[in-house]
């Protein structure tokens, strides 16, 4: 056990951690040269294309150090994006040390901070690695100072590397072996293992990634999940090198995978403790919590025949990702679809993109919303995330909405605009400080989640030319003035356009969407009224004027009454059309109408 090292790589998005993982695998001959691809551990196409890691991955490397000893290194590659922060915290709980990778031209960013603090909470030994030192803009000395001032860890012995060219990779491996502690654990104690991740394999069923803390996990053993007391028999045990290699057992300190004839990923909660049925351990490992979706939106197939394929696709994605939820729902305007819950906007985009690409579905998604707590006058508390479930305004006592604490790091030349963006989004400033003696400001803000889920991140990036970084966590619920904004086209409510907004925004948002619909809905032979309403009160209206056919064109001279008769007939016809005519709102009108204007 003294020769095992378990470590995670933590970094902000794009600071090069997946590339560093590639180099470490190469250096330890984990894969043959012909099998090496860029970002080996990012197995999904979207992960490679967007250059982000979504699922936590693991690999075991065998390394012979300069002192001649053979070491077994378990590397956990963690996601860097804020939506997947729970995956990061679980991966960190399974390790004793971390490599903190910082881009030596960009320096420390908000998510680096958040993840480092998680590592420190897990009592990790941290090795600082400065990447991209081959770039002309690299300034390692400045970044070392910044790390010491912002994070408060010693960066004098930072390792300078370039993951792209392979410079300094050997030094990283030596540092892992010499500076990081070996895992603690007792192989004779009852089995105690933490469930780090799980995914669905078409041949093996559910595969669980585990880190054994105490005891030994053997093939054929009956195990118990401590969160729900479900029992299973272990069928296979193995490790990733990154290829699967069956080993038959895992003992204290080791990281590997097991399969146990589980049908669904939802059965194995990430962060749960696994123990033996015959000889269970006395208590579960700390840090387990259920992950709940934060952002909701409805997804409808553009072709109604695709409904069953959409259900199958969602079930397949759910096999791999239990943090995302879905329930069937119907809409008068869009037909049958699903109400889905996600961890954040990136999570939503990734799932939607996977549905469209991997399953070839053509989809419409409604405006994302968050969970509001509504207390009715008879004392009931409802959790509402779908505008159509919102009770009548006369029956509502109070509405509470979720607030978050956001940490934003931004160069000071963009500070003014970022502050006004936060104020515009109903933010409350908590703290503003400067990072050491640099020109980077560290902002702490409390913001309503509903103002952040839409396009806050994109606006933040565009205002700051990409230099600002954001990390957030949900803090609490606060009472708020919330209204349901409904839209009527020709007096008929269109449920797919309804949204829940803050009272101060209702009129502006209503006018915007009505104006947009006016441009998007095709003209008809009769007049169309588009209205926005809150409660029973109309707050905005636009009118689409009708086409007018010139029915008098063929008249030449003659009596004026003939002309009047034809015009009268046209008027009657339009009236009849107006009462029976059904307006087909094109699909793209929904999507375009719900986009928020800057």
Curated annotation (Swiss-Prot):
Binding site for GTP: 14-19, 131-134
Annotated localization: Cell membrane
Chain ranges of the tr-type G domain: 2-184
E.C. no: 3.6.5.n1
Reactions catalysed according to its record: GTP + H2O = GDP + phosphate + H(+)
GO cellular component, one term: plasma membrane
Cell division listed as a keyword: no
GO biological process: positive regulation of translation
Keywords: Cell membrane, GTP-binding, Hydrolase, Membrane, Nucleotide-binding, Protein biosynthesis
Membrane topology note: Peripheral membrane protein
Major place of residence: membrane
Cited Pfam families: EFG_C, EFG_III, GTP_EFTU, GTP_EFTU_D2, LepA_C
Family according to the record: Belongs to the TRAFAC class translation factor GTPase superfamily. Classic translation factor GTPase family. LepA subfamily.
Stated role: Required for accurate and efficient protein synthesis under certain stress conditions. May act as a fidelity factor of the translation reaction, by catalyzing a one-codon backward translocation of tRNAs on improperly translocated ribosomes. Back-translocation proceeds from a post-translocation (POST) complex to a pre-translocation (PRE) complex, thus giving elongation factor G a second chance to translocate the tRNAs correctly. Binds to ribosomes in a GTP-dependent manner.
Protein name as catalogued: Elongation factor 4
UniProt source species: Wolbachia pipientis subsp. Culex pipiens (strain wPip)
